[in-house]
């Protein structure tokens, strides 16, 4: 059974295409929009188009940034350690590290990981741009590359690939520690993580 | 900590204003929009504005309908019993009844219920429009009003108010049955519902 309005149906269909939004949620969102002032709908509509029109990738780190702020605020930031680059898979990972307010180096966003099964090879993600940043003529002051990809098979594969490419350049390659999360109980940690935590033990 | 793009922040803020969408979900939706082709964002943006611009209330039943389909498809539908009007609180309730494909009469959408605590009186919902439909000169063929408001205090109050207004017009006023839902187990039904079910028992 369909709504009595084609415009509402179209809105429900459009909402239902978003990830994690089913028909029922889409219907509730559509009814909410109908009840709100037009200004609210306009705000969301223009934010959608602005995000597509104004957001570009930073020419240095490939993270998302505004068209009029390229290079991005992190790449041009004062007090950033220009000699360390943390390599991540996607922009949300940059946000996660920035929230810690602990890491002070730069980033490089690959926008994906090597995944042969999905047809994604080294040339499909921003590896070339990373190597470009490591060339001596580009300032050449990079001392360390921190690999911070997700602990999946594809992430590990990409880390291995990158380390083999970068090590010959005489730059230190590290990866973030795998171990038990803060606040977790040993009893409920999976075997793989426990093994990694044991392997990676440090002096007290 | 904020994203490196003001446009993305604006989109996250706009998404987060939707009901049931928190910051994390809004962030995921925004990243999804960034990865989709521009056409998808355009489709949602224009659906939002169309819903505000093209959707009006049916001049008869007050349900939502397209500007170019007023009176709505139900009010003008063939094979609809013009002598029964089901009074509901909101457009989603019409949809719920239409999904049953069982009820064949007309509807009247109040767009709210009387709720003195929220400052909503009888004049703030579409009661006047309902009474207008019951006037003899308006065709005057309405035989029965079915009250199908939600079983809340406000819904019951509104039902009582309507029944007192309409009964003097010589029109039958009924309300939908309260009882145990199909498929429920008696053991887990609350006392109020069980009492209503017992009161409303019918011959087998």
Swiss-Prot record, chains A, B:
**InterPro entries tied to this protein:** DNA_Rcmb_RecR, Rcmb_RecR, TOPRIM_dom, TOPRIM_RecR
Q: Which CDD domains match?
A: TOPRIM_recR
Among the GO biological process terms of this entry, one is:
DNA recombination
- UniProt entry keywords in alphabetical sequence: DNA damage, DNA recombination, DNA repair, Metal-binding, Zinc, Zinc-finger
Q: Where's the Toprim domain?
A: 83-181
Q: Does the keyword Transit peptide apply?
A: no
| PROSITE patterns documented for this protein | TOPRIM
User: What's the short name of a Pfam family annotated to this entry?
Assistant: RecR_HhH
Q: Which Gene3D superfamilies match?
A: 3.30.60.80, 3.40.1360.10, 6.10.250.240, RecR Domain 1
Key word Zinc present in the record? yes
ZnF C4-type residues are 58-75
Family to which the UniProt record says this protein belongs: Belongs to the RecR family.
Q: Which HAMAP family does its entry note?
A: RecR (MF_00017)
Functionally, this protein is described as follows: May play a role in DNA repair. It seems to be involved in an RecBC-independent recombinational process of DNA repair. It may act with RecF and RecO.
Would you tell me the protein name for this molecule? Answer: Recombination protein RecR
State the species of origin.
Chlorobium phaeovibrioides (strain DSM 265 / 1930)
């Amino acid at each position: 059974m369909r709504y009595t309005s084609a415009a509402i149906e179209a809105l429900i269909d459009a909402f239902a295409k978003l990830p994690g939004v089913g028909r029922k949620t889409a219907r509730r969102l559509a009814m909410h929009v109908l009840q709100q002032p037009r200004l609210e709908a306009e705000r969301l509509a223009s934010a959608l188009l602005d995000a597509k029109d104004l957001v570009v990738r930073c020419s240095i780190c490939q993270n998302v940034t505004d068209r009029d702020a390229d290079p991005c605020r992190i790449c041009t930031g004062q007090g950033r350690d220009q000699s360390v680059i943390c390599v991540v898979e996607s922009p949300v990972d940059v946000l996660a590290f920035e929230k810690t307010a602990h890491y002070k180096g730069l980033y490089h966003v690959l926008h994906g990981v090597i995944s042969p099964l999905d047809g994604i090879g080294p040339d499909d993600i921003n590896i070339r741009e990373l190597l470009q940043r490591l060339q001596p003529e580009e300032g050449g002051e990079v001392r360390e590359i921190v690999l911070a990809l997700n602990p999946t098979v594809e992430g590990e594969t990409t880390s291995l690939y990158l380390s083999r490419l970068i090590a010959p350049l005489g730059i230190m390659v590290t990866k973030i520690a795998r171990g038990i999360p803060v606040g977790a109980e040993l009893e409920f940690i999976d075997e793989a993580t426990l093994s990694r935590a044991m392997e990676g033990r440090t002096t007290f």
